[in-house]
Amino acid sequence: MLLDAERELRDYDPAWDFAPPAPEELTDCPAAAQFGQMLRLWKREYVYEMMRLGLEVTPYRTLEHIVGVHHVAVTAGRALRRGGVPLDLALVSGSAIGHDIGKFGCHPGERVPYLHYYYTDQWFRRRRMTDIGHVAANHSVWDLELDYLSVESLLLIYADFRVKQTRDDQGREVTKIFSLAEAFDVILSKLDAVDQAKRRRYELVYARLYDFEQFMVSRGVDVTLEGRDTPPLPEKHTALMTDREALTALTLQCVGHNIDLMHRLTGQRSFASLLEQARGETNWRRLRAYLGVFESYSLYLHIPQKVQTLAFLYELLMHREGDIRRQAAALMGEIIAGFHAGYAKERPADSRTDAGVPTDLDQWKLYLQKIIYPDHKLMPQHRRWIRYTLKFAVGSLLQRCPGREERFLAPFFAYYRHPDQLEDDVAFQLLDTAAGLPLPALTRSRQELLLRFAQGLCQREDITVRAGSMLLVDRLHRLDPGSRRPLRILQRIDCRGSASLELLRRRIMEGGVPEPLPEQVISDIFLDNLKTATPWILKQVNIRLLEDYAAREDGPVLHIATHLSNLIKVSDRVTVRHSAGNALLALAPRLTVDQRNEVSVELSRGLELGQQEFAKYIPDYLGRFALWLPPAQLEELLADLSQTLNAASVRMVASALDTVGVIYEEYDTYRARFPEEPEAYRSRRERLLGMLMKRLAGSDGGARQEAMFVLGRRVFGSGSLGEHEKRQAFLLTEQKLLETCYEEAEDALTFYYRASMLGRVYRFMTEQRLFHGGFPFEEPRPIAFFPGTFDPFTLSHKGIVRAIRDRGFEVLLAIDEFS
């Protein structure tokens, strides 16, 4: 009552009084109901009164900080909404009001700056306001290390960054709203143990805030908070921009696309709609785009959305396309590994996991059981497909949970304790998965467990189980060559019904240079590999035998390489295609130039089939194999690919784009194999990039989507392409990439492809700007206008333009629609 009377007697105080949005401002806000509940609880639990008392009994000005953050966030949020940015003002206001409430829950002796995030999360979770609580509890400056955040989270972190406490002349805390640059210095002076690595992290998150502030300025927001908001700033035409202006514009476009995408993902309705669109997709390339969205952004989803995504991905384990099943399983492992990544703050020593809240371990145990033992009501083929994905889920999870492997491995290895109780299908998948486990997972005790497991299965009637046992024992033998036990188990394996198994056992036990294979045996292996009735594990054994034999000086390398190329094109099992492709790449150095050319021609013809079930696996291996061709033959292959890029079939164009992308990504290896003049090397690389950009500007939506996918994955998001080459690619494509941002997306899928590409481009641009000295742009050249309409088919017009360009001018010209 006293505080109510105080408000009536004095004017509004921006340091002590909240000004939440009016009800009419929240009519289209999904979080409006939660926000209303929060305001009611705020009064019922006397939260504001507690904060006022905190000013009296503690030296900290927490209330003033919270009010200041709310003022900055809501003021900027209102202006952004007027600028056309979709955001939930109720979510902004609620999270800003409650973002530091956890400071009042910290116990004596606890580190408030580190633990108040946890108590904030608990306050909202216990009152079932998880949407607001998720944003409120994740407002640390280090949360900006996540590449993608919603605009509501960005506003809260931005406001919290700018509102800081300083000391007056008498040492008392004073709350002040700083500019972004001033706040950078204030926070840097307060950080604990600032070394070079921590400063680098801090500069990265500051750069993200700076880009967000510039984005707000471009939308008309007055970041000085003096009320001088304007309409969104007019956009300059791309062709009239300098390189630096284009860089700034592209950065803002990347920020805007990320905000738009996170708006679609973080809303419950929009996310459910996205899942339904993905469920209804039948084209594997389009479905791959949805999986790419989940792969890039799943880390930033709320826990209920991650649970929904895992359920959807489990359904995809029954998809008819093997690559989709593999990608879905790997993504399941990735999501489980990052299940709690959205809340990775420090916790009190006595904290407990809330009952009823899903955990990463719960989800792992659930889907481990569902993958190993699918529902018996499913079709047998679907159950086999689901089980086969086990090794991809396990491998992906272990790759992405460094330091936490043991908690996930314990429930997994529990399935290996009783081999005698397992059905053949289950036993085989466990054998196959164990053979591919990373070395750190195979401790001495686990090696013993797996040896007992393989020994218990080596006499099974099913030949695939016996083959799986042999491959697992071989892996364990290579880990400990001095042990005789694996060899004793190998001798016990029953090889009846398969000459290949007998040959492999002999090869493992004898070691050394492989014995030559008789002509009849090679012929039988070729025939078995082309039969659909031959189990895929035996085909892998055959491929291994052929690869070992081809490594001999007298091995029939071309004969085997041709067979492997055929398997890549026509095998009915995805894993056989990949095994054959890797074996072919291993044989490439042993082939003569003519033999390499012959194999590459055969693979190129596979692209021209235009049938996705045959052509989709070829680009990855054709692209890398092509880099074993001498320059003349490589130029011929590129000419053929250039022709394919002009085809009317989207499938053929997509396969050619994928191949060009692989060649571009792996092209650094070519210089060591075939030394050339630097100009020839550079010219060919630019030609490859031009082939990708050609379809980015085409009229066909499917081809443009594939070009975006390849540019994002193989160029700017590549882990193997050097920073220098990425920088050169960016300098050549910067304005063209910017131009694609202004094109209207024909459908939601094009938007997702573009957002995925721009996300990788933005990450690359930020790292270049901060850690590699930025981009070496040339000074703007003088402008020359070509009079009239330029005719690209007239040699005299081309000659005039080239002559002017060679004199140091940038030539602007007009082309009519008929040219």
Which residue ranges define each predicted feature?
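Divalent metal-dependent phosphate-bond-processing catalytic cores, especially two-metal-ion Mg2+/Mn2+ enzymes
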Residues: 1-37, 57-87, 98, 108, ...
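His-Asp-centered metal-binding catalytic motifs of divalent-metal-dependent phosphohydrolases/nucleases
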Residues: 51, 69-73, 86-127, 133-143, ...
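Buried hydrophobic core positions in alpha-solenoid tandem helical repeats
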Residues: 271-275, 312-314, 364-375, 411-416, ...
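Short inter-helical turns and helix N-cap capping residues of alpha-solenoid HEAT/ARM repeat scaffolds
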Residues: 282-283, 320-322, 379-383, 419-423, ...
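Residue-level detector of extended alpha-helical repeat arrays and alpha-solenoid scaffolds
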Residues: 287, 325-326, 383, 387, ...
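Hydrophobic core positions within HEAT/HEAT-like alpha-solenoid repeats
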Residues: 288-295, 329-333, 387, 391, ...
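Residue-level signature of the C-terminal ends
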Residues: 296-304, 334-342, 393-404, 415, ...
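Nucleotidyltransferase catalytic core that binds NTPs
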Residues: 674-682, 698, 704-819
